[in-house]
Amino acid sequence: MKLAPVKVSKDRIIRTVVGLRPFRPSGFRVEKEKIGEKIVVHNYGHGGGGITLSWGTSHIAIEELFRDDPPRGKVAVLGAGALGLATARLLQRRGVEVTIYAKDLPPQTTSNIAAGQWSPYFVSEFSKRSPRFKEQFARAARLSHRHFQNLLGDYYGVHFLMNYVLSDYPFGRGESGEESLDDLFPESRDVPPGEHPFPVKHVRQYVSMMIEPPVYLEALLRDFLLAKGSIVVRELQDISELQLLAAMGWLESPDALDRPRRFLGAAREAPGDVLRNDVL
């Protein structure tokens, strides 16, 4: 195995970013609720898997919205990050008229500073997962993976990439009772010593998708506007201002901020004037 060395040094860092990740120990919340005369579908608390699970949990959220009593008017979506835009596009594909209400738009969203690796992990504490959540999580991961496969290419900034995980200790085999998602990571194998150039005892390789948030989010926003979607840049003070609501305002949800996870990233120089986000 021959790999080009990664040129990394402090003097090549051009930007450092920090963002909160809305972590809930029990996992994300996708749930339909009626508040007064308003129908609200919550979809928040994805921890470090927001972009990864965005299409899957948004798919489930829209199923909830259409169950029993499908919307007969306009639908409002809160937030213009990965979850809000995915939800808005899925609604448009169902012929629904959508307005996004957001405090910030790309490139100022929290999603813009995510690393963008497709990896459905760090979204909950294993000991606090309910059977219902385990089933919902696995379904969301598979749905999202399939949606992202349809977005491969330069337009959306989604590409397959080989990954290497390095460790001084043997890799675990996952939690018992969890549905395996190994089939979503092709070419996954443990690389024996002598077959890799890394100075560690254990190396695992696998292929996953990498999403470039600045490219991806701008493309989704462009698609939404081309499909005659509306955007209102504002902070909502009262839910009574909206009729039907798909709530993506996860960072303002008290239980999503119960134990927020901090994300630290740095942008470095790369050949060809391309920027890649590196998780530190």
Residue ranges and their predicted role:
Residues 5-7, 18-37, 111-113, 143-228:
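Flavin (FAD/FMN) cofactor-binding and adjacent substrate-gating region
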Residues 31-52, 57-59:
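Short FAD-binding loop at a beta-strand-to-alpha-helix junction that anchors the flavin cofactor
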Residues 49-56, 127, 132-143, 203-219:
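Short beta-strand to alpha-helix junction loop
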Residues 55, 62-65, 196, 202-255, ...:
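Helical element adjacent to the flavin cofactor pocket in flavoenzyme catalytic cores
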Residues 73-99:
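N-terminal Rossmann-like FAD-binding beta1-loop-alpha1 element of flavoenzymes
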Residues 103-134:
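Conserved N-terminal glycine-rich FAD pyrophosphate-binding loop of Rossmann-like flavoproteins
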Residues 259-276:
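Flavin (primarily FAD) binding-site architecture
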